[in-house]
Every structure is written in structure tokens, then in C-alpha cells.
């Protein structure tokens, strides 16, 4: 898929260190789809076997001049995902390339802290991280797991309005870290889009949508 996307837009050979990567197409990968036991109990094996594959895909995306986004997972995999991202994003082979990003889910209560972690990582490594803010895709599973395991609380917000507020609060924090993060907002909600525009105050960012949806917006 990386080869196909890169060749379709003739991005091969483009300057990987330039900001043009933000205007280029991008590809998303799901870590749990690349490894059969993607769970914290297998952390050492995941880091040893999956991290090299994730890095290789990132290097391939860079060679084609396209973006590379790691999709969000369920909350119990968050720390593992951040470990993989930190290990691969920091690799010297990606120096000067700002195409390596990830998705953050606003319905997770830890979203603002994830943003702070990513900003710190970006500053330590010396290049920006594109961050796609989404509302979240695993609500039913997250709530069910918390109930089955008898957890004292839920890792996600259980009311839509709380998620909406979290989305805007997290968006504001992303802009606060504008030197370290490139904000990307994936939503089809017109009110949220208008609010993000107001928060941005002219600072650079982009809106994203699912193919075939939200065209009028």
C-alpha cells in the first residue's frame, strides 16, 4: 500500500525534510493488526519483534515522501503503543522527517497527558509529530471491559458531551505545543470544526475526514 500511494502521487524522491509531507497523502497502520499478541503481558516480545517492522514501514513511507500515522488502540494498549512509537520515532534513520504521526482519542481520559508526552518526545528528538485527534472508536468495548473486570471507573468518558469538551480541551493543548506538534482534526461535526477554527487563531493545522463523508463541510 505504501508503494502504491507513493507512486500514485509521484512523491518518490521528494525532500523528506520539507513540510511538503503535510500536503502529501498518508497511510495509517494498526499495530494490533501487525502482531498476534499485541498486549502488555508480551511487552518485551512486542518491542523486540514489532518495533523493527514498524520502523521499516516508517522508513519506507519516508522514502516515498508520504505521511505515516499509527492508529489508536484500546486504552489497555496505550502504554505499549507509546513505547513502540517512542522507540521507532527516535531512530536516527528518521532524522529530519516530520511524516511520522499518530492518532489520539479524545474520549480517553488520558488524552491531554498523551499530548504532553508526545510534545516532550518531539522536543527531545528535535522534530514535530503530526497528531490526528479523533473522538474514539472503541467505546462499547471499553465500557464492557471495565464492567467485566470490575474496574473502579471507566478509562473513557461515558457521556458524549464530556467527550466533546475533551476534544476541544485536547485541541487547545495541541496548539499550545505548536512548536512540537502538527495538529490534525478528524471530525465531521460542524460545531467542533468551527470551535477548532476559533481556537487555532490562524495557526496552521488541518481537518481530516473519512472518504466519502463530510464532503459538504
Task: Label every model-predicted segment.
Residues 1-217:
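Positively charged, amphipathic and often flexible ligand-engagement surfaces
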